[in-house]
Every structure is written in C-alpha cells, then in structure tokens.
C-alpha cells in the first residue's frame, strides 16, 4: 500500500542521498513530486514504490534550522501529517522547529538507528561498503574518468580531443578529422565524460536519417549510453505532453525535424545542455540565403549552451562552407565572411613557417621575419633561443603560436598523414565473364551495376529453380577464394540485403562454408549474434556477408580480407566499406578483393574508382568533389560509350584529382594538426588506460559485489564469464542488463572482437549501478564481528566507525573530484582512544569472524548504553581530519580554477575565440564550489562492533 504523503513533509532519497533533504510538493494521482532544495533538483516517483525514507528525528537528536542555528530535540508532535520539533537552542532557550524549516543539508544518521534496531548486516557487506567508498573516491579523482570505459582501443588523438573538449564548460567546437580517424568516437567520449562529470545531463544528437541506426549502435555498444531514437511514429504515439522531456539522450533525424513544426516546438521547450550535429557540412549556407536545416540548427545553437559539430575537413568544405560551421558556434566572433577570409590569408604564412620549423628544425630568415611580425617584440627572446637550436624554445614557440591560432580552440582536425598508424592496402582485381542471362536485362536505376537484383525481380523467374547465384561467375569465384583462404576471416559487402541473403544460401548449398549474414532487416540482437558468430575463432563463421546499410556502425578490425562483391555508386560509400576494416589500430595489410563482370558497367566503375580516383589504395578526400563535378558525365558513359570518350573522362578526372590533392597538401596547417593531436598529451592517457586495464582491482571487487547480491558467475571461455541471477538474488533492481543472464569480459581485446559480451570497466552501468545500490541504501552500514587477537582480553569491545565528508551540491560543480567520499576511519578502544592510524582496515579485517545475527543483536542491546556515547564521541575524533580534507579540497579547487582562469584570460588577449561567457561561468563555478565546500558535513556512514574472543 502507498505511504501517506503530505506537502511539506521531509523525505530522503534512498537512491540519491547526495540530493539532501527532499520536500514533498504534490501528490497527483499515481505520481509524487519531491523538490530537493539543496541542489535545485525535482524528482517524480511512482506513488506505489517511491524509493524514499521519511526523515523523523527523536528526542536527543541535534537538528539544524535552514538559517543555520541548531536545537536539541526534546519532544516531537505530529500536526496534520507534519512533524513539529520542540527543544532547546544553543542558548538553552525553548524553541519550536517545524520540519518544513529544517536545513536542506541535514544528514540522516541511519547507521546507529539500524544498529540499535537490530538490523545487523553480514560482515562481508561492511567490507564491501568500505571498498565501494574507496573505489568511488579513486574514480572521481581519476583523470581517466569518462575516457577509459569505451569499447575501443585507446587512441591518443581521440583521448586528447575528448579531454580537452569535455572538460570545458559548455564546449562549442568543430570536430573535422579525416575519414577513419573516429569523429563519432570522439563525440561519444565527450558526451560520456560530460554526463559522468555532471557538466551535461541532457544531450540532443541530430543526424541524417541514414545514420540514425549507426549512431544508436555506436552509443549503445561502445559507451553503454541508452539513447532514445525519435521519429515521427514515436513522437505521435507518445502519451507525454512533451515526448523529448522523457529522455536524457535523444537521437533525432534532421530531415524529419525540419518538416515537423510541432516536434520542433517540443524540442526547443525540452531544454538541452549539449547538442551534437553529425554531417554538419550538409547544412547549406550562403551569405544571402540559408537552408531550412541550417536555420533550424542555428536557432538551436542560440539556446543550447554546448555544441559539437561533426563535419568534413575544412579543405574538403571550402572556406565559405567552413566559415558557415564556425558561425554556428560563435556568431559574434565569426560574423563577417570577408574578414574571415582576410584573417585566414594573414595566418597562412605563419602556418608555413611552423611547417618549416617542424621539417627542418630551424627557421629561415623569411620565416623568422613572418613569426616576429605575428608575435611582435614579446617573441624576440623566444626566436633568438630557437635560432640557437634550443629545442625547448621551439616547443614553447609552437605553443605560443597555437594559442594565437584563429580557430585553434574551436576546430580540431586530425589527418591520416599526421596521425600515422594506418595499414597498407592491397588491391586484387578479378575480371570475370558476364553471363548471357544478364545481357538481356531491362534497364533500370543502376540495373547493370547490380544485375542479380534485376534478374531475380523478373516476373517469369522462379525463385526456387532459376536462382542468379547458380550462373553468376562471382559466386563460384567467391567459393574458390574462401577455400583458398581456408579459415581466414573474410568480410563480404554488397549493396543490397537480398544479395547478401542469397549469397548465404549459395554458400550453404554449394560449399558448406560456415557463413553468416548482416543486413538492415535484422534487429540489433540478431546482428550481435551474427557478429559474435563471425568473431568466434574456434567455431565461428569464416565469412560475414553484409549489405551496405546493414554494416553501418560496425567495425571488424580482427579481419583484414574484404570482398567487394559489387561496387557502390558513390566514392564515400566505397570509403565507408573499406573503413569497416581500415581503421586506426588495424594490425594487418588490408587485402581488397574486387570481382567484376567484364565489358559491363561494373568494369567501368572499377576503372573509375581505381584509375581516376585512386580510391582503393588510398583514402579519397577529393572523391565527393570529383563525383559532383564529373557525375553527370560518368553515369551515361558507364552504360554506353566508346573507349576514347571513356579514357578522356578518366584522364580528366585523374588530372583534377592530382590538382586537388596538391592543393590539400600545400594547405595543410601543421599548427592545427599539432593542436588537434595533443602533442604527446594523448599518449600519456593511452598508457594510463592500458595500465588500468591490467589491474585486478575491478574483477576482485566485482566478485564480492556479485556474491553480496546473489549473482552467480561461471566461466564462459578464456577471459569471459556468464552472470545469472541466483534464487537468492538480493535485489531485483541490480543492473544485470538481462533477467536471463549476461556474458561479460574485463578484457578490452576480447570485447572488441565479441560485441555480444559486456565490456566491464569502472564506468560500466552494471558497475556504477551496483556501487550506487551499496552506497545509496543501508547495505553494510552495520556489522558485529568476533576479533581473534591474543593481545586483546576476551570480552574487550572495539568500535569501528566510518565517516564520509559529504557536500551536497549540483553534480555539474564536480566537487567529488576535490572532496570524494573516501572513508574517514575511527577505531575506538574501551578507553575511547582512536587506534585507526595504527591498525589498517585490511589488517583488522583479516582477524575477524562472523557472529550469528541473534547473538549479535542480543549483545548490542546489552551494550547499548555503553555504545551510544562512544558513537556520539566518534565524530569529534575525525573532525580535525575532516576539516583538513575540506580545506585541502578548497585549496585544490581554488588553485585549479585560478590557473584555468589565468590561462583563459591570457589566451583571450591574443585569441578572440575564448568567450566571455566561459570566463564568467568559471568564476561563478569557483565561488559556488568554495561556498558549497564550506558547508561540507561529516556523515556517519557505517558502524562495526568488534568483540574480542
């Protein structure tokens, strides 16, 4: 039955104790609304099972008024459901304090209440609570928090960008890495770190419709982010007054949003902290006219504090289009296209001078003059040191120039040339005779490029008797190729789902080669199973056959043989296909196998990609521009042209490609590349993450957590476990992920090849959710144990108290970094002396044995009068350490923010991309954080009573 709630009553959240005291605002039907004034948060709960505990103090308790004065309770009245406390204040005067006027920061002394009420927990739970506090503290202070838990190999430039961007207040940046460098992972890392730190709590992701599924898979698989995909159907069917308010992370197709004004209104009303826009280069802007998509994103960017734009490289975009993206981020700074062009031209010689310094290690007189003109007299000493061969001075000079870079803080652009670490590509072409059955096919959209689809679609063709794969020579070739490669993993990609499914049938019927298929008609779970079957080295499929759309968002870097069963109609799609294997971190040469039908449009398309665009052996940053320029001539010539016409087109396109590539190379901005790559900072993060991966602390901790909650674990295979709820499962809300069970691994490499396994890190929802269940409830906050130590007289009682320094503040202030909930131990002997400095927790723990609950309860009741004053005395013992900890937290917070303010203020003087709002927000955060830390209080977290035996 639902509890009786009255407006004004004070309750505390069982799952979010850090919110402070809550005040009931309203009870409406089946919903209860509670305000938490300390943080400004409001929560709605289902009335039947609200995770709340009534705050009710007893005579003898000390309580605090919201104005700060204290009183000792003598009597409690219940007036129409509201509690009224009567007692004495500090001046020994009689006072009355209604619960509505209680301080929002009051702690709830739950541990002592439970101990004396006979609610004594198993001994192992007390240790679990202590270790949970320690691990939580360590993670909150870690520089890797939000960076190490992604299901991906740690890569330096991605980690550098993620930390640099995510640690800003309301970041507004352009991510413009070249293809294959992982812009989506960078954006996901920024989102993940901002969510974990509390800098953002509501995120909007706008993408082209065809990329929605890819983003959904990436966010869920790599980051464990439960993104809600919104389309017209979901929006219309929702019962909520504003469907967007029901989710923290919304994934929305821009095409639908532009056409639906009602959805736009709801989106604006929902309020967001961070907006991510993929494929932002497709937003069309001209000085005199903008597209509806650009106008909508511009309006959103005016109201949403943080904006991430993912786009093609500036060189691919052209200067005008590049300016249009920057204008979305900071319209005050980038308001005049002509001024932007002039500024870019003025900066080019400086970038060229830096290129010279990087390549030759010294500056020519002309380069020296250029940099001196840019830095002014303040750069003279630095330039002199550079000329003397001082390498440290060279690094400082580059940093000075970086700080002054016109777009260095808002634009991140890494290139393959700068990053390195990509595999070589090898092309194997297989011309095959075109079968007669394809020669008489009716013409259609790209019918000659995908003849099997057109053939099978003919009304007079029987699916069972006349299958295209019985005569198409590419199928026989594929079977022979797979047999030659034996058990080597091979990825096959084709344009259509029908072709993929037919190929699987063909391999099963004609060869018995183990194969699996991957297409857009399958749900995520089915695709996971197919990917896992392909990844399994021992019993898995040799070949995975993917359709174009079905393979989006999936990378199979453990394979290095790629069969392009047909060719796509656009070079970007070709690059996407090759990119399934050709990613940074791939350890093998990419073997590209391309069968095509001779004297058909397939042969000509192969020649176009290979001879004109060079798109097989290298990435093709100019492909989109060349397709746009030559596309109208290309399509007719694919089907019908003499050799002379065709060769002329190939030659013209090749010449234009070489010209554009030369332009791109000379336009390379080495300063920007240095800034985007992190100049070595990312490498340190990679090393730290790999070191953390090798530690055993997490598996050891999780084993104790699983034991406590009744989760059974058994070996699945090497580096993998199967988790299942046991009959004794303690809490059905434990975030196992699946009621039937789940397979997990702590091994990053295993997780990368087996997407059906959960990759367990400190950031995983199972770990975080389990830790929250321990700390937000009362689990393990009382225990009684027998201590076996010959130095102690039998019957001696020791009292171990765990306190935490608690600060109630909005998560966005990130005060947990400075004042984490590490346990402050106090171990009191019979004389009230604190022995904690001499007896470590683990040393003590090893000497303890459990006591039957009934015996423990009997002992506590007998010792209540002796224990209660000792518990009250414990706080005074740890108060000096608490005060030191708070002072140190304030010092570190002030030092960090002062340093960042000084850096940004100096930077603003030479680089206008530092926004005033950023400095104002940082100052406010400093003052607010220091004030909140001043109010930090000690909270009794757990009590363990030890009896010598």
Swiss-Prot record:
Keyword Transcription regulation belongs to the record: yes
CDD domains: DEXDc_RapA (cd18011), SF2_C_SNF (cd18793)
SMART domains recorded: DEXDc (SM00487), HELICc (SM00490)
Domain Helicase C-terminal: 474-628
UniProt keyword Transcription regulation, yes or no: yes
Short sequence motif named DEAH box, residue ranges: 278-281
InterPro entries for this protein: Helicase_ATP-bd, Helicase_C-like, Helicase_RapA, P-loop_NTPase, RapA_C, SNF2-like_sf, SNF2/RAD54-like_C, SNF2_N
Keywords: Activator, ATP-binding, DNA-binding, Helicase, Hydrolase, Nucleotide-binding, Transcription, Transcription regulation
Pfam family, one: Tudor_RapA
Single biological process term from Gene Ontology: regulation of DNA-templated transcription
Sites where the protein binds ATP: 177-184
GO molecular function: ATP binding; DNA binding; helicase activity; hydrolase activity, acting on acid anhydrides
E.C. code: 3.6.4.-
Domain Helicase ATP-binding: 164-332
Family as reported in the entry's similarity comment: Belongs to the SNF2/RAD54 helicase family. RapA subfamily.
Biological role: Transcription regulator that activates transcription by stimulating RNA polymerase (RNAP) recycling in case of stress conditions such as supercoiled DNA or high salt concentrations. Probably acts by releasing the RNAP, when it is trapped or immobilized on tightly supercoiled DNA. Does not activate transcription on linear DNA. Probably not involved in DNA repair.
Subunit structure: Interacts with the RNAP. Has a higher affinity for the core RNAP than for the holoenzyme. Its ATPase activity is stimulated by binding to RNAP.
HAMAP family: Helicase_RapA
PANTHER family: DNA ANNEALING HELICASE AND ENDONUCLEASE ZRANB3 FAMILY MEMBER, SWI_SNF-RELATED MATRIX-ASSOCIATED ACTIN-DEPENDENT REGULATOR OF CHROMATIN SUBFAMILY A-LIKE PROTEIN 1
NCBIfam families, alphabetized: PRK04914.1
Protein name per Swiss-Prot or TrEMBL: RNA polymerase-associated protein RapA
Organism from which the protein derives: Pseudomonas fluorescens (strain ATCC BAA-477 / NRRL B-23932 / Pf-5)
């Amino acid at each position: 039955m639902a509890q009786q709630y009255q407006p004004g009553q004070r309750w505390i959240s069982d799952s979010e104790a850090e919110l402070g005291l809550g005040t009931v605002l309203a009870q409406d039907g089946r919903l209860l609304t509670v305000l938490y004034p300390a943080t400004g948060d409001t929560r709605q709960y289902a009335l039947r099972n609200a995770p709340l505990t009534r705050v009710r103090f007893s005579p003898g308790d000390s309580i605090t008024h919201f104005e700060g004065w204290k009183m000792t309770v003598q009597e409690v009245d219940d007036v129409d459901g509201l509690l009224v406390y009567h007692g004495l204040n500090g001046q020994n005067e009689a006072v009355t304090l209604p619960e509505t006027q209680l301080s929002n920061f009051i702690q709830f002394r739950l541990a002592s209440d439970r101990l004396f009420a006979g609610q004594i927990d198993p001994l192992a739970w007390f240790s679990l609570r202590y270790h949970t506090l320690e691990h939580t503290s360590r993670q909150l202070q870690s520089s890797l928090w939000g960076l190490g838990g992604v299901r991906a190999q740690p890569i330096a430039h991605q980690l550098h960008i993620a930390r640099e961007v995510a640690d800003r207040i309301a970041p507004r940046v352009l991510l413009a890495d070249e293809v294959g460098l992982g812009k989506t992972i960078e954006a996901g890392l920024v989102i993940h770190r901002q969510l974990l730190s509390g800098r953002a709590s509501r995120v909007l992701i706008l993408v082209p419709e065809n990329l929605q599924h890819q983003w959904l898979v990436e966010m869920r698989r790599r980051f464990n982010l439960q993104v809600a995909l919104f389309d017209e159907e979901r929006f219309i069917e929702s019962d909520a007054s504003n469907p967007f308010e029901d989710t923290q992370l919304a994934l929305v197709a821009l095409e639908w949003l532009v056409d639906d004004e009602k959805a736009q209104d709801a989106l604006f009303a929902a309020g967001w902290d961070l907006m991510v826009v993929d494929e932002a280069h497709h937003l069309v802007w001209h000085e005199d006219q903008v597209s509806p998509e650009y106008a909508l994103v511009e309006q959103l960017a005016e109201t949403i504090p943080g904006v991430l734009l993912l786009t093609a490289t500036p060189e691919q975009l052209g200067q005008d289009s590049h300016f249009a993206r920057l204008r979305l981020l900071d319209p005050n700074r980038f308001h005049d296209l002509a001024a932007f062009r002039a500024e870019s031209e003025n900066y080019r010689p400086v970038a060229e001078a830096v290129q010279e310094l990087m390549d030759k290690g010294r500056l020519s007189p002309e380069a020296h003059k250029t940099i001196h003109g840019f830095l002014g007299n303040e750069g003279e000493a630095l330039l002199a040191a550079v000329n003397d061969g001082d390498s440290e001075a060279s690094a400082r000079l580059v940093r000075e120039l970086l700080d002054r870079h016109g777009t260095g803080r808002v634009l991140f652009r890494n290139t393959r040339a700068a990053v390195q670490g990509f595999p070589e590509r090898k092309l194997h072409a297989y011309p095959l005779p075109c079968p007669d059955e394809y020669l008489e096919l009716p013409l259609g959209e790209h019918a000659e490029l995908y003849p099997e689809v057109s053939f099978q679609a003919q009304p007079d063709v029987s699916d069972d008797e006349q299958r295209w794969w019985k005569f198409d020579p590419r199928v026989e070739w594929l079977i022979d190729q797979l047999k030659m490669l034996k058990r080597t993993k091979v990825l096959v990609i084709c344009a259509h789902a029908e072709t993929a499914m037919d190929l699987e049938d063909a391999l099963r019927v004609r060869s018995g080669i183990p194969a699996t298929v991957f297409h857009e008609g399958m749900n995520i779970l089915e695709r996971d199973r197919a990917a896992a079957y392909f990844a399994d080295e021992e019993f898995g499929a040799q070949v995975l056959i993917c359709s174009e759309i079905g393979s989006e968002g999936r990378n199979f870097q453990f394979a290095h043989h790629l069969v392009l069963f047909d060719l796509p109609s656009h070079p970007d799609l070709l690059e996407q296909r090759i990119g399934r294997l050709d990613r940074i971190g791939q350890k093998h040469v990419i073997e590209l196998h391309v069968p095509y039908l001779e004297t058909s449009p397939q042969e000509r398309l192969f020649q176009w990609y290979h001879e004109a665009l060079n798109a097989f052996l290298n990435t093709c940053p100019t492909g989109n521009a060349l397709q746009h320029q030559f596309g109208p001539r290309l399509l007719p010539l694919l089907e019908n042209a003499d050799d002379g016409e065709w060769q002329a087109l190939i030659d013209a396109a090749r010449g234009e490609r070489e010209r554009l590539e030369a332009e791109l190379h000379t336009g390379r901005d080495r300063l920007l590349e240095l800034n985007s790559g992190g100049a070595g900072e990312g490498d340190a993060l990679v090393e730290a993450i790999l070191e953390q991966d090798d530690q055993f602390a997490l598996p050891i901790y999780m084993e104790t957590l699983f034991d406590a909650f009744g989760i059974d674990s058994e070996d699945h295979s090497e580096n993998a476990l199967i988790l299942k709820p046991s009959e004794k499962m303690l809490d059905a809300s434990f975030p196992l992920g699946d009621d039937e069970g789940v397979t997990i691994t702590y091994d990053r490499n295993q997780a990368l090849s087996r997407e059906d396994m959960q990759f367990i890190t400190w950031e995983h929802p199972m770990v975080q959710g389990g830790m929250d269940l321990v700390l937000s409830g009362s689990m393990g906050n009382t225990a009684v144990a027998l201590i076996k130590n010959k130095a102690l007289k039998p019957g001696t009682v020791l009292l171990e108290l765990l306190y935490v320094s608690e600060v109630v503040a909005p998560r966005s202030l990130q005060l947990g970094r400075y004042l984490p909930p590490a346990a402050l131990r106090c171990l009191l002997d019979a004389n009230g002396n604190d022995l904690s400095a001499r007896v470590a927790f683990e040393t003590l723990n090893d000497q303890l044995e459990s006591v039957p609950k009934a015996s423990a309860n009997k002992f506590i009741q007998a010792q209540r009068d002796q224990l209660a004053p000792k518990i009250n005395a414990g706080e005074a013992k740890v108060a000096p350490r608490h005060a030191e900890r708070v002072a140190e937290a304030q010092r570190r917070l002030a030092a960090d923010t002062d340093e960042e303010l000084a850096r940004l203020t100096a930077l603003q003087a030479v680089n206008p991309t530092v926004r005033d709002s950023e400095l104002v927000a940082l100052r406010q955060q400093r003052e607010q954080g220091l004030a909140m830390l001043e109010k930090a209080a000690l909270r009794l977290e757990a009590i363990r009573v030890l009896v010598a035996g």
